[in-house]
């Protein structure tokens, strides 16, 4: 059997419209030769075709899963959306357990996108916690990558309660072993080590005026926040695992640690488990006793 390569070109797409289309305008003789010489087909990479809601942009995570499975897999974000709409999130046993604690810290990305987390999920969790009479702290990472560069300000204004801490996603969601960045997010959430503020909107605007975009916002903490206390529960609400895992693993001493999805193999306190997918591409190749080499990067 000849070697076969499955190469995924991140950000590569097809359109016959020339406006804003660098791929069509570029000189790419090798790609053009392959395309003209061999059979070609186009795949949908967003919305229902990859298990997302109608009209929702795709991303690398859902694209890779769909290619590897060879079928449509309902994504975490869609499953959580359905649970919110039909009310089953309220009775989720892990969430109910987390809300038995008098104080819960919600931790994750504040975004208008739907790649790593969802703004609607934050609102739903806060609403359920309020109904349960639980005191909540809100630790948020401003986005700037899957949302606009300075969209965090408008999102903070839409929140039903003020953040407890705020820091850019470059710190809270590093996945490239830059532990000096992760440490800043950890110290902010765990020990309130950041610039104290009474007004997060003013703090964000000051950063914007200095040319700082959302992903690089420095650490801010509410003036009244004193850090995580004994008996507090933590609930990480990002549904995409890879970008939050590094910070999540930093909270080693907290036994009341919950997550929206299964971040590590040792987790058992997660709200939504991974789907059971049989007969994947790599699984079938493995059953055929063929050798495989998988190459990817931790940072795009």
Predicted feature residues:
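Conserved structural scaffold segments of CAZyme catalytic domains across common CAZy folds
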Residues: 243-246, 283
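Short glycine-rich anion-binding loops that position phosphate/pyrophosphate groups of nucleotides
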Residues: 12, 241-242
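Residue-level detector of short, conserved catalytic/binding motifs and their immediate flanks
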Residues: 3, 232-234
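Active-site nucleophile/metal-coordination loop of metallo-enzymes that catalyze phosphate/sulfate
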Residues: 1-5, 12-171, 177-180, 184, ...
